[in-house]
């Protein structure tokens, strides 16, 4: 769970910025987007295979 304690003399904007940064680092927003709608296991497998294929093509282009 992400939490931020506001320091003495710290503005709300700075505290909010730190909170957003911690949420992004923890991957909370991406997890929420991923769980927003149910995704069938077959669709997950297809997406995973497509992502692997893209990574392989990217590596080939770089020359690794």
Swiss-Prot record:
- CC terms in the record's Gene Ontology section: ribonucleoprotein complex; ribosome
Superkingdom assignment: Bacteria
The answer on whether this UniProt entry bears the keyword DNA damage reads no
One GO BP on record is:
translation
Print the keywords alphabetically: Ribonucleoprotein, Ribosomal protein
GO MF, one annotated term: structural constituent of ribosome
Family listed = Belongs to the bacterial ribosomal protein bS21 family.
Which PANTHER family does the record cross-reference, listed alphabetically? MITOCHONDRIAL 28S RIBOSOMAL PROTEIN S21 (PTHR21109), SMALL RIBOSOMAL SUBUNIT PROTEIN BS21 (PTHR21109:SF22)
The molecule here is called Small ribosomal subunit protein bS21
Query: What is the protein's species of origin?
Result: Anaeromyxobacter dehalogenans (strain 2CP-C)
- Which gene underlies this protein? rpsU
């Amino acid at each position: 769970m992400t939490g931020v304690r506001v320091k003495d003399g710290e503005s709300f904007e700075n505290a909010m910025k730190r909170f957003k940064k911690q949420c992004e680092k923890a991957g909370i927003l991406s997890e929420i987007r991923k769980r927003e709608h149910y995704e069938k296991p077959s669709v997950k497998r297809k997406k995973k295979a497509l992502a692997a294929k893209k990574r392989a093509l990217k590596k080939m282009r770089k020359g690794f």
